[in-house]
C-alpha cells in the first residue's frame, strides 16, 4: 500500500511489516478530485489497541476501488481513531484518523445500509448488516468528532444534537455548496445533502459545515429567541440558496432564487422564501407554516427528566401535536424517504424510526400532553407494535392513532379510510392536512390467550370399520363412543327414512362390536370374577338401552307418518341429571309463544327417543370408565396412553357435575365429541331452519356453560350463530332445534380447561384478525421465505406475488384439509360443530389478507348485525380452501359465515402444533387452548371524506368571495366638473328607470317582490349623492361609486326578470316604457367606460350584452322557446374569464398599460409587467401580439409564452373590438 501511495511513512519507525496472512490489502486510497492524493498508511498492533477503551466494534463490509469488490473486516472505534483488520484476533490493524472526518449515508435505494467515512485523505465505504446497525455506527462516528469520551446514551438522542445528517445524492439542476458557495461537481451535481434541512455540501466541505441543522429544542435556538409580552416565540430559521424554480418572494411576490449562484433565503419551518433585500421587511416571528397544528415548536422542548428523556411542555398554541413513527423497512425500504420528508415538514424531534429504538422514546417525549396524535407509517405489524407500547405506558386516553399505509397488507389503513398504499412522499403536506380534519373512532383490541397442554385427537371417521392405528385396546374402545354419538345424531337429525334405518343398523353392529371388544380387553386386564360380573351387568344394561332406543324409534316413525306437517322448533332448556326435564322453558315460551300447550303428539315419542339415546350413551360411558379403571390398576403404561387428560380438583368436578349436560363430567370427558357424523349428514332444509339459526342465539341459559368468565360481566349480547351458513361443507340445517343442539353439545370437551384466565399467557394482541390453519400456514411460509431471502421480498408487488404462489401451493397440497379433526371451536361458551374445512378466521375489521371483505358484506341482515370494529363483537368464518380465499377478493361470499360473538375459544388437539397468525404475524401454536377476549379500545383517526368535501366547498366559496382585488386605479376623492355633469345625466336615467319600475309594480306584485331590494338600495344610494345640497367641493367619489354599483345591479336584475315569465304579464305600453328606460340606462353606462375609476364595476362583455340584449324585442325574447345548452366546463371557463375581466374592467381594446399589467399579474407572470409597461403595450396591441413579438419583448420561456398566448386568445373571443 505504501508503494501504491508513492511515499514512505514519515515520523517514528513503525512496526515491522506483518506476515502475508495478516496483511490488510484492502486499504486502497479513495479520494475525490481536489483532495490530497498522498495516503499515509498507519497501523497498530493488537496490544496497543487492547490498552485503549473500545467505544464500538463489530463486523462491517468494506468496499474497495475495484468494481463490485468488497470484503468483511472487523472494525473497532476508539476515540477519534477507527481500526480495522480481517478478524477480531488479528495482530495488525489499519488506522483511520477521524479528526477531520465526516460521515454520510450512501445506501443505494436505501437497501444496502452503506455509509461513507470521509477524511481529507481518503473515502471509506462501509456496509452494515441492517439499518439500525448502520445508524448506530453513524451516530458513534459523528459523536467522536467533537467529544473524546463517547456516551452510549446519546444513540437515541441523535435528534437533538444539531449536527447535519448527511446522505449522498444527486440533483437534477445546478446546486451550490452552502459551505464554499461553489457549484457541486458533475452533471448530476453529486454531493452531500442533509436529510433534515437540505443543507448542501461537497464531500470535502462537509467537515467544515456548521452545526446549525433544524432546531429541535429551546437550547438549539440560542440567542435568536424572541421574547415579548406573550412569552417566548420562535423566529424564522433561514437557509441560503438552492431555491426551487417556482420560488416567489413572500414580501414582494416576485421571483427569487437563482441557478447561477447561491442567493436568497428559505425558512426551514414555514417554507417562506424571500429576497435578501426583503428579508428585513418580513415579520420576525415564524408562523410554522401550513402544518403548524401538527408541529411541536422547539420552544416546547426545554427540559430533561431524571431518566435522561426530554420532556415536552404544552404551549397554548400546541394543543394536539403529531408524533410520527416510521418503519424504515416498510414498502421496499421506502420508509426512509418518508422519514426524511417528515423531518423536513415537522420538528425532527417528533419523528422516530421504529427500526432504531422502537416507539418508547417518542411516547415518553409526548406523555405529558393532555392530547396528542400519532401517525404510524408502516404495515399492520408496526401499528400493533406502537399500540402495545401505548398499553405499557397507559396512554390510550391521551392519544389518537392514524395510519399511513407503507406495508404489504395495510388492512387497518383501508378500514380507517387512508387507502391501501402510499408511495408518494411529496403528498405528505396534503396528508397531514387530512389528518387534522380526521374524525375519531374506537378500535376494539383483543387479547389472544394461550394455555398449552395435550388434548386427545378426534376420530377421523364415524364407522366401525375404521383401521385403528392405536396401540392400546382401551384407546380403541374410546372411539366407539364417538361412533355411537355420530349415529345417534343421524337418527335424530335426518328426515329421510332410509338414513334412519341405515344408521340404526350400523348402531346395532357398533354396540355389539363394542361389547365384544370390551370383553376381550377385560379378559386381558383382569382375572377377578367379581369384576367380570360387574362388567357383564353393565353390558346387559347397555343391551336394554339399545332395545329401548330402537322401540322408541319405531314409535316415533309411526307418529311421524300420521302427520303431514314437520314438527316445530322446541326451545332449549336444561335437563336434569337423568336426562329428563321440562322441555318447554320460559325462554321457549318467549320464542314459540303458546305452542307448547298445543304441540302435536309427535313430541312425546321424540322426547322419549332423545332420553333413550342419552341413556345409551351413558351406559357406554360407564363401561368405558370401568374398563379404564381396571386398566389403570393393572397396567402402568396406561398413564402414557392417557397423558392428554387434565386433572381436575374436587371443586371443579363438583361444578362440572352440576352442569346440565347429558355427558358426565369425568376426567375423560374430553373424548366426548361434537357430532362426529356432522360431515356425513345429508342436507335437509326443514321449515324450522330459521328458528334454529336464530333461536339458538337468543342467549338461553342451557346453551351456555356455567363459569364462562368475562361473559357475565359484559353487556347482554344475543350471540348469533348460523349453522346452515357453513352448509358448503357440513350437513345444512339442523331440524329439531334444541333437541338436536342438546345432543350435539352434550359433551363439554373444554371442562378440563382452567376457567381462570390467570393460568393463560397472553401471546399477543389482535387488532385486525386471527387465523388458524390454511391462511396461517401461508403467512408462516411467507415469513420464513422473507427471513431466508429478504432481497426477494422487498416490494409490495413481490410480496403479493409470493402470497399467490404459496396459496397455489396449498391449493394442491391441502395441508390442513382435515382441520376440523384437529381443533374444536367455541363461541361465547357454546361449542360449534365444524364442517370439513382448512382454516378458521376470526375478524375484528372488515378487511382481511390485503383488502378482502371475508365476512362477505357490510350491512345488517336477518341473522347477523353489520360488522364493525367498535362494537366489541367478533366475526367467525370458515376457510374451505385457497380457491375460496382467492374468489373472496372478487365476489362477496357469505356461505362460510359461522358466528358473531364476544369471546372465542379454540382447542388444538393431538400432539402436533397448528399454524396460527395474528395480523399477519404467524407461528406454530402447540396443542392446548386459545381464548380470544376483549382487552381494551384504542382511539383511531378515521378519514372523513364527507367532511373534507364540505370543507373544501366552503373554502372555495370563501376564495371566490374574497378573490376580487382592490381597484387598480385609485379614484379621486372629489369629482371634476366634467364628471359631475356626466353623473347628473346618469342620475336622471337611473331615476327614470326606478320610476318606470315603481309604476309597473303598482299593478304587478311579482315585480315588486323581485326588484324591491334593488330599487330600495339604488334609491338610498342616489339620495346619498343627490339628496343633499351640493357643496362647493363637489360630489364624493365613494358615494358615486356605490351608486353606480347599485344601479348597475338593478339594471341586471330587471333584464333577467324581463327575460322570464314577467314579460308575458306586462302590457305592451308598460314594456315599451320599461324598455326605453333600460336603453337610456345602458347608454349612460357605456359613457362611464371613459372614466377610468368607474370602469371597474362594469362586467366583461358589457358592451356585447348591451348591443345584443337591449336592441332585441322584449316580446320575442321572452317568448322564445329555445334554450342554449352550455356544457359545465364551458360555463366554468366563461365564469372564470368574467371574474378576471370584471376585476380589470372595460373592453380589452380600451385597456391601458395598467390594466395590461394587472392582467399579467392574474396570469402569475408579474416578472413581465415592467417589460410590457416600458414598451407601452395597451389593450389594442395586446390582442395582436404573436409568438415572435413576445420573443422580441424578452419572453423566452416556452411555458410563459404559451400562457400569454392562451390568455390573449381568450381575450380575443370576448372582446367586441376583436370581432369587429
Curated annotation (Swiss-Prot):
Protein localization: Cell membrane; Membrane, Clathrin-coated pit; Cytoplasm
Recorded family membership: Belongs to the eukaryotic diacylglycerol kinase family.
Membrane topology: Peripheral membrane protein
Keyword set, alphabetical order: ATP-binding, Cell membrane, Coated pit, Coiled coil, Cytoplasm, Endocytosis, Kinase, Lipid metabolism, Membrane, Metal-binding, Nucleotide-binding, Phosphoprotein, Protein transport, Repeat, Transferase, Transport, Zinc, Zinc-finger
Gene null: resulting phenotype: Homozygous knockout of dgkd is lethal. Fetuses are smaller and newborn mice develop respiratory difficulty and die within 24 hours after birth. They show an abnormal open-eyelids phenotype which is associated with significant reduction of the expression of the EGF receptor/EGFR in the basal layer of the epidermis.
BP GO annotations: diacylglycerol catabolic process; diacylglycerol metabolic process; endocytosis; lipid phosphorylation; negative regulation of phospholipase C/protein kinase C signal transduction; phosphatidic acid biosynthetic process; phospholipase C-activating G protein-coupled receptor signaling pathway; positive regulation of clathrin-dependent endocytosis
Single GO cellular component term: cytoplasmic vesicle
Species this chain originates from: Mus musculus
Catalytic activity reported: a 1,2-diacyl-sn-glycerol + ATP = a 1,2-diacyl-sn-glycero-3-phosphate + ADP + H(+); 1,2-di-(9Z-octadecenoyl)-sn-glycerol + ATP = 1,2-di-(9Z-octadecenoyl)-sn-glycero-3-phosphate + ADP + H(+); 1-octadecanoyl-2-(5Z,8Z,11Z,14Z-eicosatetraenoyl)-sn-glycerol + ATP = 1-octadecanoyl-2-(5Z,8Z,11Z,14Z-eicosatetraenoyl)-sn-glycero-3-phosphate + ADP + H(+)
ZnF Phorbol-ester/DAG-type span: 163-213, 235-286
Primary localization class, coarse: membrane
Pro residues: bias regions: 7-22
Annotated PH domain residues: 53-146
Annotated pathway: Lipid metabolism; glycerolipid metabolism
Entry-linked InterPro entries: ATP-NAD_kinase_N, C1-like_sf, C1_DGKdelta_rpt1, C1_DGKdelta_rpt2, DGK, DGK-delta_SAM, DGKD_4H, Diacylglycerol_kin_accessory
EC class: transferase
Protein name (database record): Diacylglycerol kinase delta
